[in-house]
Amino acid sequence: MALVSYSSSEEDEGETSEPPGRRLPPLPPPTTVLRMFQDMEGDEDLDENTKHEGRIRSFKHERGNWATYVYIPFQPQEEFLDLLDELVSVAAENGVLLTKMSEFHISQSQTVVLRHHWINPFVESLKDKLHCMYRFLCIAERIKVYTNQEKTRTFLGLEVSVGMEHLLEVVSEVDRSLQEFNLQTFYQEPSFHVSLAWCVGDKYEKLKGSCLLELQKVIDRFEDSDTLTRFNAEEIRCKAGNKTFCIPLL
């Protein structure tokens, strides 16, 4: 809906002017209109969120651009969070203060930029390619350290050891959708993992070596760790700005 302003020359010259006196304040826009613009500009709030806790955007924000990525969610048992607390504690003892992730997943794409009007067509493309895929088992039990491409953040993650072939199949289909929109595809040799915690800066050297061995021992000794680090991939999600779309697997 376009909002059009008219100059005084375009107004009806036959109308009589209002009598002098105090004017009433203008009425507020209808709630439906406000909601419409709130939905269209939801990426403004996202832009502020990406600056939170010192995180740095990997691409310049522009109005109408929506940060978008595809992933498989991992919803852990409560005991898994106890294991994560121990891992964060060991990292702190080695001089690295980590922030636990608020949600857990296995990435199936890089973060790309979608224009608002591309979102629904992109999601439909994903659904068309992924809706016939079956659920599969994932096991992620080996601790590993990662950094983002810009070396501005460091992550502690669990590398996937079972389910690789299925994940590669998903990525192949997601890449096809990305290519349709001339967007960057996933890494050629991906290391599928569940990110557990993160910190600002490049802390790779501090976490590797003896610290990494100590972290792995925590996992190996933790009660029922073999069941806590496995899950069934039951759906694929696409998050675009503040919108999340779910594609269930068979």
UniProtKB/Swiss-Prot annotation:
Sequence positions that bind UMP: Q149, Y187, S191, F192, H193, V194, S195
Record function comment: 3'-5' RNA exonuclease that trims the 3' end of oligo(U) and oligo(A) tracts of the pre-U6 small nuclear RNA (snRNA) molecule, leading to the formation of a mature U6 snRNA 3' end-terminated with a 2',3'-cyclic phosphate. Participates in the U6 snRNA 3' end processing that prevents U6 snRNA degradation. In addition also removes uridines from the 3' end of U6atac snRNA and possibly the vault RNA VTRNA1-1.
Bilayer-crossing regions: none
EC identifiers of the protein: 4.6.1.-
GO cellular component: nucleus
Entry keywords, A to Z: Hydrolase, Lyase, Nuclease, Nucleus
Gene Ontology MF: a single term: lyase activity
Record-given protein name: U6 snRNA phosphodiesterase 1
The UniProt record lists the keyword Acetylation: no
Active site residues of this protein: H105 (proton acceptor), H193 (proton donor)
Record organism: Xenopus laevis
Biological processes per GO annotation: U6 snRNA 3'-end processing
InterPro entries recorded: Usb1
Compositionally biased tracts (Pro residues): 22-31
Region (Disordered): 1-31
Keyword Protease among UniProt keywords: no
One Pfam family per UniProt: HVSL
Compartments reported by the entry: Nucleus
